[in-house]
């Protein structure tokens, strides 16, 4: 299995180095749910600004403040502790008057707004995230500048970030140990983390191998394509390749790679043979996903950061802004820019 740091680059290995997250203010994330609170209902959506607090810790503190069980507070995604983040929490408080949430106090946290909502906020129920990153001590400004220009046109590999695999790859190692035994894993969080790490590693491997062929954006017979921003896909046939290639070039369609699991992967013929060969050595992880009935799915191989802009504060410091859809990783953008001395594994998804 290819380690995250050794995955194939789309724009070649960066020539320069830089520092990611010298302080929390260098990594700002603003969650975009894609909808507004309903204004009524048994749930309360709370938008919180936090610095130095992880999401679960804040959710538990909010539950204590509201005198409800911790399981009654949900969120769409984990946000990094060592960053400045805005995100929504959702508390189920039925049949009660609206609590005065402006009185909620927690060091490093501030309630920005809150309103009633009809539905529980579930994990993954967000449109995306807006990022403002500051890279410091950049050793090669010209290289980073050109890479930013290239990323605007060609995007970056849509890799799952190193944080998906845990500190030191602990989640992937757990999955491998589990795959080698039939011992049940009772802890639901461990099950989720380990299965997610296994499937993500296989996806990354397929994309890395496709990049080695230099045809990551070239449609081949049997590729599974999806409309940009959509989840469903269809299979490319030889007769359609020219027209489909035009639509891929126009970023109307995205070529996908497998998220292996039980059931058919989605590709056929040449594309399927390539994907199977790319992960042929990882029989244990594939068997684990099938055994645990994790359904196969698809994910776009390339990621195009939206609203990408940047500003050089000086020759060694650059502020970069962009928006990514849910499930994408800012660190997969950064790794195409610099060889960073920051720690990816400590950046929450």
UniProtKB/Swiss-Prot annotation:
Query: Which Pfam family, just one, is annotated for this protein?
Result: TruD
Q: Which SUPFAM superfamilies match?
A: Pseudouridine synthase
The Enzyme Commission number assigned here is 5.4.99.27
* UniProt GO cellular component terms: cytosol
What are its GO biological-process terms?
tRNA pseudouridine synthesis
- The catalytic site is made up of 80 (nucleophile)
Annotated InterPro entries: PsdUridine_synth_cat_dom_sf (IPR020103), PsdUridine_synth_TruD (IPR001656), PsdUridine_synth_TruD_CS (IPR020119), PsdUridine_synth_TruD_insert (IPR011760), TruD_catalytic (IPR042214), TruD_insert_sf (IPR043165), TruD_pseudoU_synthase (IPR050170)
* UniProt keyword list: Isomerase, tRNA processing
Under catalytic activity, the entry for this protein gives: uridine(13) in tRNA = pseudouridine(13) in tRNA
* TRUD domain residues: 155-303
Q: Which GO terms describe its molecular function?
A: RNA binding; tRNA pseudouridine(13) synthase activity
| Residue positions binding substrate | 27, 129, 329
Summarize the protein's role. Responsible for synthesis of pseudouridine from uracil-13 in transfer RNAs.
Q: Which family does it belong to?
A: Belongs to the pseudouridine synthase TruD family.
What name appears for this protein in its UniProt entry?
Answer: tRNA pseudouridine synthase D
Q: Which organism is it from?
A: Escherichia coli (strain 55989 / EAEC)
Q: What is the lineage of its organism?
A: Bacteria, Pseudomonadati, Pseudomonadota, Gammaproteobacteria, Enterobacterales
Give the encoding gene's name: truD
């Amino acid at each position: 299995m290819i380690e995250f740091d050794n995955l194939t680059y789309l724009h070649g290995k960066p020539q320069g180095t830089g520092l990611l997250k010298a302080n929390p203010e260098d990594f700002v994330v603003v969650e975009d749910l894609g909808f507004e609170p309903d204004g009524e209902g048994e749930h309360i959506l709370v938008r919180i600004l936090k610095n130095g607090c992880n999401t679960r810790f804040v959710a538990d503190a909010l539950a204590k403040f509201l005198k409800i069980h911790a399981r009654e507070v949900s969120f769409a995604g984990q946000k990094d502790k060592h960053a400045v983040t805005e995100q929504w929490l959702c508390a189920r408080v039925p049949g009660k008057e609206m609590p005065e949430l402006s009185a909620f106090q927690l060091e490093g946290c501030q309630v920005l707004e809150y309103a009633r909502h009809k539905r529980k906020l579930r994990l993954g129920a967000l449109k995306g995230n807006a990022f403002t990153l500051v890279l410091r001590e950049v050793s090669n400004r010209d290289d980073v500048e050109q890479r930013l220009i290239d990323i605007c046109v060609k995007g970056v590999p849509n890799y799952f970030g190193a944080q998906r695999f845990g500190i030191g790859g602990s989640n992937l190692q757990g999955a491998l140990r589990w795959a080698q035994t039939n011992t049940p894993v009772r802890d639901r969080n461990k099950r989720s983390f380990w299965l997610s790490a296994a499937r993500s590693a296989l996806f990354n491997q397929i994309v890395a191998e496709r990049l080695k062929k230099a045809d990551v954006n070239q449609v081949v017979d049997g590729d599974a394509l999806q409309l940009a921003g959509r989840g469903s896909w269809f299979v490319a046939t030889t007769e359609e390749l020219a027209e489909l290639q035009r639509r891929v070039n126009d970023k109307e369609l995205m070529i996908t790679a497998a998220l292996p699991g039980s059931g058919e992967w989605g590709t056929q013929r040449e594309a399927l043979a390539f994907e199977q060969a790319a992960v042929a050595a990882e029989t244990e992880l594939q068997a684990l996903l099938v055994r645990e009935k994790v359904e196969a799915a698809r994910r776009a191989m390339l990621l195009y950061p939206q609203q990408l802009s940047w500003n050089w504060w000086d020759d060694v410091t650059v502020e970069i802004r962009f928006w990514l859809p849910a499930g994408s990783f800012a660190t997969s953008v950064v790794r195409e820019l610099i060889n960073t001395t920051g720690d990816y594994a400590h950046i929450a998804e």
